[in-house]
Protein backbone atom coordinates (compact mmCIF):
# COMPACT_ATOMS: atom_id res chain seq x y z
CA UNK A 1 0.00 0.00 0.00
CA UNK A 2 1.26 3.46 -0.89
CA UNK A 3 1.84 5.82 2.01
CA UNK A 4 1.65 9.10 0.10
CA UNK A 5 -0.97 10.63 -2.19
CA UNK A 6 -0.48 11.66 -5.82
CA UNK A 7 1.71 14.74 -6.39
CA UNK A 8 0.12 18.08 -5.66
CA UNK A 9 0.95 19.37 -9.15
CA UNK A 10 -1.31 16.82 -10.86
CA UNK A 11 -3.18 18.04 -13.99
CA UNK A 12 -6.08 20.44 -13.42
CA UNK A 13 -9.26 18.61 -12.46
CA UNK A 14 -11.73 18.01 -15.31
CA UNK A 15 -15.33 17.88 -14.00
CA UNK A 16 -17.31 14.73 -14.72
CA UNK A 17 -19.58 15.13 -17.78
CA UNK A 18 -19.03 18.88 -17.65
CA UNK A 19 -20.25 19.77 -21.14
CA UNK A 20 -23.26 17.45 -20.99
CA UNK A 21 -24.38 18.91 -17.66
CA UNK A 22 -24.00 22.48 -18.85
CA UNK A 23 -25.86 21.72 -22.09
CA UNK A 24 -28.76 20.22 -20.15
CA UNK A 25 -29.05 23.32 -17.97
CA UNK A 26 -28.53 25.75 -20.85
CA UNK A 27 -32.14 26.00 -22.13
CA UNK A 28 -33.42 27.03 -18.70
CA UNK A 29 -30.68 29.64 -18.33
CA UNK A 30 -31.30 31.01 -21.82
CA UNK A 31 -35.08 31.12 -21.26
CA UNK A 32 -34.60 33.24 -18.15
CA UNK A 33 -32.37 35.62 -20.07
CA UNK A 34 -34.94 35.90 -22.87
CA UNK A 35 -37.55 36.74 -20.24
CA UNK A 36 -35.40 39.68 -19.18
CA UNK A 37 -34.15 38.36 -15.87
CA UNK A 38 -30.91 36.93 -14.57
CA UNK A 39 -30.95 33.14 -14.35
CA UNK A 40 -30.13 31.57 -10.98
CA UNK A 41 -28.52 28.12 -10.81
CA UNK A 42 -27.50 26.17 -7.72
CA UNK A 43 -24.42 23.95 -7.84
CA UNK A 44 -25.46 21.93 -4.81
CA UNK A 45 -22.21 19.96 -4.63
CA UNK A 46 -19.70 22.64 -5.57
CA UNK A 47 -16.51 20.64 -5.07
CA UNK A 48 -13.61 22.31 -6.85
CA UNK A 49 -15.96 24.47 -8.88
CA UNK A 50 -15.33 23.05 -12.34
CA UNK A 51 -18.96 22.75 -13.39
CA UNK A 52 -19.71 26.20 -11.98
CA UNK A 53 -16.75 27.74 -13.76
CA UNK A 54 -17.97 26.31 -17.06
CA UNK A 55 -21.48 27.72 -16.55
CA UNK A 56 -20.30 31.15 -15.43
CA UNK A 57 -17.91 31.37 -18.37
CA UNK A 58 -20.56 30.43 -20.92
CA UNK A 59 -23.42 32.50 -19.50
CA UNK A 60 -22.35 36.05 -18.68
CA UNK A 61 -25.63 36.96 -16.98
CA UNK A 62 -25.85 33.87 -14.76
CA UNK A 63 -25.95 34.10 -10.97
CA UNK A 64 -24.59 30.97 -9.33
CA UNK A 65 -25.09 29.67 -5.80
CA UNK A 66 -22.50 27.11 -4.78
CA UNK A 67 -23.09 24.84 -1.79
CA UNK A 68 -20.60 22.49 -0.17
CA UNK A 69 -20.16 20.98 3.28
CA UNK A 70 -16.39 20.73 2.74
CA UNK A 71 -14.65 23.94 3.81
CA UNK A 72 -11.47 23.01 1.94
CA UNK A 73 -13.48 22.64 -1.26
CA UNK A 74 -15.10 26.04 -0.67
CA UNK A 75 -11.69 27.67 -0.28
CA UNK A 76 -10.35 26.12 -3.49
CA UNK A 77 -13.47 26.74 -5.54
CA UNK A 78 -13.63 30.29 -4.21
CA UNK A 79 -10.17 30.95 -5.62
CA UNK A 80 -11.13 29.32 -8.91
CA UNK A 81 -14.32 31.35 -9.20
CA UNK A 82 -12.86 34.66 -8.01
CA UNK A 83 -13.17 36.23 -11.50
CA UNK A 84 -16.93 35.73 -11.14
CA UNK A 85 -17.29 36.76 -7.49
CA UNK A 86 -19.84 39.47 -8.30
CA UNK A 87 -22.13 36.74 -9.69
CA UNK A 88 -21.65 34.03 -7.09
CA UNK A 89 -22.71 33.13 -3.57
CA UNK A 90 -20.67 30.32 -2.02
CA UNK A 91 -22.23 28.77 1.06
CA UNK A 92 -20.95 26.31 3.66
CA UNK A 93 -23.90 23.95 4.05
CA UNK A 94 -25.08 20.42 3.35
CA UNK A 95 -27.03 20.27 0.11
CA UNK A 96 -30.25 19.12 1.74
CA UNK A 97 -30.30 22.61 3.30
CA UNK A 98 -30.96 24.18 -0.10
CA UNK A 99 -34.33 25.61 0.99
CA UNK A 100 -32.74 27.42 3.93
CA UNK A 101 -29.86 28.65 1.76
CA UNK A 102 -32.23 30.13 -0.81
CA UNK A 103 -34.34 31.74 1.91
CA UNK A 104 -31.26 33.31 3.50
CA UNK A 105 -30.13 34.69 0.13
CA UNK A 106 -33.59 35.96 -0.79
CA UNK A 107 -34.31 33.72 -3.78
CA UNK A 108 -37.86 32.39 -4.15
CA UNK A 109 -37.07 30.02 -7.01
CA UNK A 110 -34.20 28.91 -9.24
CA UNK A 111 -33.73 28.05 -12.90
CA UNK A 112 -31.44 25.09 -12.46
CA UNK A 113 -29.75 22.81 -9.98
CA UNK A 114 -26.80 20.48 -10.41
CA UNK A 115 -25.89 17.64 -8.05
CA UNK A 116 -22.67 15.67 -8.53
CA UNK A 117 -23.03 13.05 -5.82
CA UNK A 118 -20.51 10.98 -3.91
CA UNK A 119 -16.93 11.71 -2.95
CA UNK A 120 -15.02 14.40 -4.84
CA UNK A 121 -11.64 14.13 -6.52
CA UNK A 122 -10.30 16.55 -3.91
CA UNK A 123 -11.37 14.27 -1.08
CA UNK A 124 -10.01 11.16 -2.79
CA UNK A 125 -6.65 12.74 -3.57
CA UNK A 126 -6.03 14.33 -0.16
CA UNK A 127 -4.41 11.53 1.83
CA UNK A 128 -5.22 12.93 5.26
CA UNK A 129 -8.96 12.86 4.53
CA UNK A 130 -9.00 9.06 4.72
CA UNK A 131 -11.40 8.39 1.82
CA UNK A 132 -9.01 6.30 -0.28
CA UNK A 133 -7.93 2.72 0.38
CA UNK A 134 -4.88 2.94 -1.88
CA UNK A 135 -2.63 4.66 0.67
CA UNK A 136 -2.44 4.90 4.44
CA UNK A 137 -4.09 7.87 6.14
CA UNK A 138 -6.07 8.80 9.25
CA UNK A 139 -9.40 6.96 9.24
CA UNK A 140 -11.64 10.01 8.92
CA UNK A 141 -13.88 10.19 5.79
CA UNK A 142 -15.85 13.23 6.96
CA UNK A 143 -16.78 15.59 4.14
CA UNK A 144 -17.16 18.31 6.77
CA UNK A 145 -14.21 17.85 9.11
CA UNK A 146 -15.63 20.38 11.58
CA UNK A 147 -18.40 18.12 12.84
CA UNK A 148 -19.76 14.60 13.11
CA UNK A 149 -18.32 11.16 13.76
CA UNK A 150 -15.36 9.86 11.79
CA UNK A 151 -14.92 6.47 10.17
CA UNK A 152 -12.65 5.55 13.08
CA UNK A 153 -15.52 6.29 15.47
CA UNK A 154 -17.76 3.96 13.48
CA UNK A 155 -15.40 0.99 13.22
CA UNK A 156 -14.30 1.32 16.85
CA UNK A 157 -17.70 1.83 18.49
CA UNK A 158 -20.41 0.15 16.41
CA UNK A 159 -21.50 -3.32 17.44
CA UNK A 160 -20.74 -6.23 15.16
CA UNK A 161 -24.42 -6.37 14.20
CA UNK A 162 -24.43 -2.67 13.30
CA UNK A 163 -21.26 -3.05 11.24
CA UNK A 164 -22.72 -6.00 9.34
CA UNK A 165 -25.84 -3.94 8.63
CA UNK A 166 -24.11 -0.87 7.21
CA UNK A 167 -21.48 -2.81 5.25
CA UNK A 168 -24.17 -4.98 3.68
CA UNK A 169 -26.69 -2.19 3.13
CA UNK A 170 -24.50 0.74 2.10
CA UNK A 171 -21.64 -1.25 0.57
CA UNK A 172 -23.68 -4.08 -0.94
CA UNK A 173 -20.88 -6.32 0.32
CA UNK A 174 -21.74 -10.03 0.44
CA UNK A 175 -18.89 -10.74 2.87
CA UNK A 176 -20.17 -8.16 5.38
CA UNK A 177 -20.40 -10.72 8.18
CA UNK A 178 -16.82 -11.91 7.79
CA UNK A 179 -15.50 -8.36 7.54
CA UNK A 180 -17.41 -7.10 10.58
CA UNK A 181 -16.27 -10.10 12.62
CA UNK A 182 -12.62 -9.44 11.75
CA UNK A 183 -12.97 -5.73 12.52
CA UNK A 184 -14.39 -6.41 15.98
CA UNK A 185 -11.67 -8.95 16.73
CA UNK A 186 -8.91 -6.61 15.57
CA UNK A 187 -10.14 -3.57 17.48
CA UNK A 188 -10.18 -5.61 20.70
CA UNK A 189 -6.40 -5.76 20.35
CA UNK A 190 -5.96 -2.15 19.24
CA UNK A 191 -8.45 0.53 18.11
CA UNK A 192 -8.29 1.44 14.44
CA UNK A 193 -6.65 4.76 13.64
CA UNK A 194 -5.58 4.52 9.99
CA UNK A 195 -6.95 3.30 6.68
CA UNK A 196 -4.00 0.98 6.10
CA UNK A 197 -4.70 -1.27 9.07
CA UNK A 198 -8.39 -1.45 8.16
CA UNK A 199 -7.57 -2.41 4.58
CA UNK A 200 -5.37 -5.26 5.80
CA UNK A 201 -8.12 -6.61 8.06
CA UNK A 202 -10.63 -6.47 5.20
CA UNK A 203 -8.17 -8.11 2.83
CA UNK A 204 -7.80 -11.06 5.20
CA UNK A 205 -11.57 -11.35 5.65
CA UNK A 206 -12.45 -11.52 1.95
CA UNK A 207 -11.85 -14.93 0.34
CA UNK A 208 -8.87 -14.94 -2.00
CA UNK A 209 -10.93 -16.01 -5.02
CA UNK A 210 -13.35 -13.10 -4.53
CA UNK A 211 -10.49 -10.65 -4.00
CA UNK A 212 -8.95 -11.68 -7.32
CA UNK A 213 -12.11 -11.09 -9.33
CA UNK A 214 -14.12 -8.41 -7.52
CA UNK A 215 -11.86 -5.36 -7.61
CA UNK A 216 -10.16 -4.02 -4.51
CA UNK A 217 -11.46 -5.99 -1.50
CA UNK A 218 -11.90 -2.82 0.60
CA UNK A 219 -13.85 -0.85 -2.00
CA UNK A 220 -17.36 -1.73 -0.82
CA UNK A 221 -16.60 -1.45 2.89
CA UNK A 222 -15.02 1.98 2.40
CA UNK A 223 -18.08 3.08 0.44
CA UNK A 224 -20.32 1.88 3.27
CA UNK A 225 -18.32 3.70 5.93
CA UNK A 226 -18.25 6.91 3.90
CA UNK A 227 -22.01 6.80 3.38
CA UNK A 228 -22.61 6.13 7.07
CA UNK A 229 -20.24 8.84 8.30
CA UNK A 230 -21.72 11.52 6.02
CA UNK A 231 -25.32 10.25 6.07
CA UNK A 232 -25.16 10.52 2.29
CA UNK A 233 -28.33 8.66 1.36
CA UNK A 234 -30.39 10.25 4.14
CA UNK A 235 -29.24 13.66 2.92
CA UNK A 236 -29.96 12.74 -0.71
CA UNK A 237 -33.53 11.67 0.10
CA UNK A 238 -34.16 15.15 1.50
CA UNK A 239 -32.07 17.09 -1.02
CA UNK A 240 -33.61 15.95 -4.30
CA UNK A 241 -37.20 16.91 -3.37
CA UNK A 242 -36.03 20.22 -1.90
CA UNK A 243 -34.04 21.09 -5.02
CA UNK A 244 -36.81 20.15 -7.44
CA UNK A 245 -39.40 22.01 -5.37
CA UNK A 246 -37.29 25.16 -5.74
CA UNK A 247 -37.37 25.05 -9.55
CA UNK A 248 -39.33 27.69 -11.42
CA UNK A 249 -41.48 26.57 -14.36
CA UNK A 250 -38.97 25.61 -17.05
CA UNK A 251 -36.25 25.07 -14.47
CA UNK A 252 -34.07 21.98 -14.75
CA UNK A 253 -32.45 19.54 -12.32
CA UNK A 254 -29.40 17.51 -13.33
CA UNK A 255 -28.14 14.76 -11.02
CA UNK A 256 -25.09 12.53 -11.39
CA UNK A 257 -24.88 9.44 -9.21
CA UNK A 258 -22.10 6.88 -8.91
CA UNK A 259 -23.68 3.75 -7.49
CA UNK A 260 -27.04 2.03 -7.56
CA UNK A 261 -28.12 3.16 -4.09
CA UNK A 262 -27.91 6.82 -5.10
CA UNK A 263 -29.49 6.25 -8.50
CA UNK A 264 -32.47 4.39 -7.02
CA UNK A 265 -33.32 7.38 -4.83
CA UNK A 266 -33.06 9.84 -7.72
CA UNK A 267 -35.00 7.57 -10.08
CA UNK A 268 -37.83 7.04 -7.59
CA UNK A 269 -38.38 10.75 -6.98
CA UNK A 270 -38.11 11.75 -10.64
CA UNK A 271 -40.48 8.94 -11.64
CA UNK A 272 -43.11 10.25 -9.23
CA UNK A 273 -42.83 13.74 -10.67
CA UNK A 274 -43.19 12.70 -14.31
CA UNK A 275 -46.22 10.47 -13.60
CA UNK A 276 -49.85 11.51 -13.26
CA UNK A 277 -51.22 11.16 -9.75
CA UNK A 278 -54.73 10.41 -11.03
CA UNK A 279 -56.04 7.00 -9.90
CA UNK A 280 -55.61 4.30 -12.59
CA UNK A 281 -58.68 4.16 -14.84
CA UNK A 282 -60.02 7.47 -13.52
CA UNK A 283 -61.89 9.14 -16.43
CA UNK A 284 -60.68 12.68 -15.72
CA UNK A 285 -57.20 13.94 -14.96
CA UNK A 286 -57.34 17.13 -12.92
CA UNK A 287 -54.70 19.79 -13.47
CA UNK A 288 -53.45 19.13 -9.95
CA UNK A 289 -52.89 15.48 -10.90
CA UNK A 290 -50.93 16.08 -14.08
CA UNK A 291 -47.18 15.41 -14.11
CA UNK A 292 -45.16 18.32 -12.75
CA UNK A 293 -41.88 17.20 -14.33
CA UNK A 294 -40.67 16.14 -17.77
CA UNK A 295 -37.82 13.69 -18.27
CA UNK A 296 -34.86 15.08 -20.22
CA UNK A 297 -32.75 11.92 -20.32
CA UNK A 298 -33.60 8.48 -21.64
CA UNK A 299 -33.57 6.65 -18.36
CA UNK A 300 -30.09 6.92 -16.94
CA UNK A 301 -27.38 8.14 -19.31
CA UNK A 302 -23.80 6.89 -19.08
CA UNK A 303 -20.54 8.54 -20.17
CA UNK A 304 -19.08 8.05 -23.62
CA UNK A 305 -15.60 6.63 -24.15
CA UNK A 306 -14.37 10.16 -24.86
CA UNK A 307 -15.81 11.46 -21.58
CA UNK A 308 -14.19 8.62 -19.65
CA UNK A 309 -10.87 9.32 -21.37
CA UNK A 310 -11.15 12.97 -20.31
CA UNK A 311 -11.85 11.95 -16.70
CA UNK A 312 -11.54 8.24 -15.79
CA UNK A 313 -13.61 8.83 -12.65
CA UNK A 314 -16.59 9.44 -14.91
CA UNK A 315 -16.72 5.72 -15.73
CA UNK A 316 -19.29 4.91 -13.05
CA UNK A 317 -21.35 8.10 -13.45
CA UNK A 318 -25.07 7.84 -14.12
CA UNK A 319 -26.91 10.96 -15.27
CA UNK A 320 -30.59 11.85 -14.91
CA UNK A 321 -32.30 15.17 -15.62
CA UNK A 322 -35.81 16.61 -15.44
CA UNK A 323 -37.58 19.89 -16.20
CA UNK A 324 -40.40 21.46 -14.20
CA UNK A 325 -43.40 21.88 -16.50
CA UNK A 326 -46.11 22.65 -13.92
CA UNK A 327 -46.30 24.06 -10.41
CA UNK A 328 -45.50 21.70 -7.58
CA UNK A 329 -48.35 19.39 -6.65
CA UNK A 330 -49.63 20.09 -3.16
CA UNK A 331 -51.38 16.79 -2.53
Curated annotation (Swiss-Prot):
UniProtKB keywords: Cytoplasm, Methyltransferase, rRNA processing, S-adenosyl-L-methionine, Transferase
Catalytic activity: cytidine(1402) in 16S rRNA + S-adenosyl-L-methionine = N(4)-methylcytidine(1402) in 16S rRNA + S-adenosyl-L-homocysteine + H(+)
InterPro entries xrefs: RsmH (IPR002903), SAM-dep_MeTrfase_MraW_recog (IPR023397), SAM-dependent_MTases_sf (IPR029063)
Molecular function via GO: rRNA (cytosine-N4-)-methyltransferase activity
EC number of this enzyme: 2.1.1.199
GO cellular component terms listed in the entry, alphabetical order: cytoplasm
Name of the protein this chain belongs to: Ribosomal RNA small subunit methyltransferase H
Annotated source species: Renibacterium salmoninarum (strain ATCC 33209 / DSM 20767 / JCM 11484 / NBRC 15589 / NCIMB 2235)
Amino acid sequence: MATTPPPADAPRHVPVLRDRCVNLLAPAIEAANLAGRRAVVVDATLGMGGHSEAMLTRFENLHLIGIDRDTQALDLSGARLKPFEDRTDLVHAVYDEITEVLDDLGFESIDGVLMDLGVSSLQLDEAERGFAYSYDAPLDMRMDTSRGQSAADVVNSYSETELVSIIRRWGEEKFAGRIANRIVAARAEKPFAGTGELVEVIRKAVPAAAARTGGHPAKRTFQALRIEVNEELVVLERAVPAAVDALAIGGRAVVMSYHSLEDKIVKKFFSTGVTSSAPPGFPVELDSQKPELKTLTKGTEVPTEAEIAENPRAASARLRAVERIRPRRTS
